[in-house]
Regions:
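Phosphate-binding loop of NTP-binding sites
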Residues: 143-149, 162-258
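Preference for protein termini
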Residues: 1-175, 197-202, 207, 239
């Protein structure tokens, strides 16, 4: 068995429709069967000590390994990934005879990490947005409500009081996600051109750049969730075409789901 990585899932993915953490382990099919059971037991032990409830688990057995995931609060995803790494160390001890990790020390570290990452205002805003049927996008730096020209963005540590907001002003714009094996960028450009011909102000993200109509905002590979957020927070955009690469889908989940 070989630990590959543990990371946040910041949006809907193949495993969940919400945020969480996933860990990839290279192993045989037989090893995966033993690992899944041990991993869940260790994660449940840590989550119980932390007082985390209503957590969902998911696994995906793949050729050459297994993905191990569980849901986590929006403002504790780095800590959740650290829990996954600790669970791997505990499994490595149980199944492979590696040194045993110290549970008490790890628990103290997790509590400190959760306290440092905590952002109850962000969690509350997410709940209020869901209750009002409003799309919320977030990352380490910013959170936004609505999409495109109907959106507003704030620093993630300077969020508004949800009760002060006029929720009806936050609405979506037509948004298309383009994924697949070949031809994504070409399809995005073609669709954006069609929308521009219909007098739309089009935001597009691709492996080449982010653009608003014919103005290139930044040249880079923007086919992941970050590109989607950049386009959908632009106040001029009234339609969006987003290239959605499989790498971003697998590593972080969707950048937007409305």
């Amino acid at each position: 068995m070989q630990f590959l990585d543990a990371r946040r899932l910041t949006g809907p993915s193949l495993l969940f429709d919400t945020h969480g953490t996933v860990m990839d382990i290279a192993c045989s099919a037989d090893e995966a069967d033993r690992l899944v059971s041990a991993w869940k037991k260790h994660v449940e032990r840590m989550l119980s000590a932390l007082g985390w409830n209503d957590i969902e688990f998911a696994t995906a057995k793949l050729a050459g390994g297994v993905s191990l995931a569980f849901t986590a609060p929006l403002d504790a995803l780095y800590a959740a990934s650290a829990i996954n790494e600790w669970a791997w160390a505990a499994c490595d001890h149980q199944l492979n005879g590696a040194d045993a990790p110290d549970f008490s020390a790890a628990l103290a570290e997790m509590r400190d990490a959760i306290a440092e990452e905590a952002n109850p205002a962000l969690v509350d805003l997410e709940a209020r947005a869901a209750a009002n049927g409003v799309t919320m996008l977030w990352d380490d730096d910013e959170a936004s409500l609505g999409l495109g020209r109907h959106s507003q963005t704030w620093p993630v540590r300077e969020l508004p009081d949800p009760q002060s907001l006029e929720w009806s002003q936050f609405r979506d714009v037509p948004t298309a996600l383009v994924t697949g094996t070949n031809g994504k960028t070409t399809t995005v450009r073609l669709a954006a051109h069609i929308l521009r011909a219909a007098d739309r102000t089009v935001g597009m993200s691709s492996t080449d750049y982010i653009a608003i109509n014919n103005e290139v905002v930044d040249r880079d590979d923007w086919s992941g969730p970050g590109g989607a957020r950049n386009v959908l927070r632009h106040k001029a955009v009234d339609a969006a075409i987003l290239e959605t690469a499989r790498g971003g889908l697998l590593r972080r989940g969707l950048g937007v789901c409305t």
